[in-house]
């Protein structure tokens, strides 16, 4: 599989950090983690990405933030 790093302004699923299932603790500040599963890669802003060894790999970003990224599924497409 070929991975392209391009700096175009085209929004692509892999390059923009987004999260549909974001889990936060009730602490202040909250500790939020994205539980989304992506195939073969995590979004570009992810520092700690963990993937299964299956084909294709199921990847989760293990980063913790005090916020959630915007949802990946845009509401205006349907």
From Swiss-Prot:
The record marks 26-27, 53-54 as: Reactive bond. GO terms for molecular function: serine-type endopeptidase inhibitor activity. Keywords: Disulfide bond, Protease inhibitor, Serine protease inhibitor. GO terms for cellular component: extracellular region. Transmembrane segments: none annotated. Gene3D superfamilies: Cysteine Protease (Bromelain) Inhibitor, subunit H (2.10.69.10). Pfam families: Bowman-Birk_leg. Disulfide bonds join 18-72, 19-34, 22-68, 24-32, 42-49, 46-61, 51-59. CDD domains: BBI. SUPFAM superfamilies: Bowman-Birk inhibitor, BBI (SSF57247). Changing residue 60 to H: In the I-B sequence. The I-A sequence is shown. These inhibitors strongly inhibit trypsin. Belongs to the Bowman-Birk serine protease inhibitor family. This is Bowman-Birk type proteinase inhibitors I-A, I-B, and I-A'.
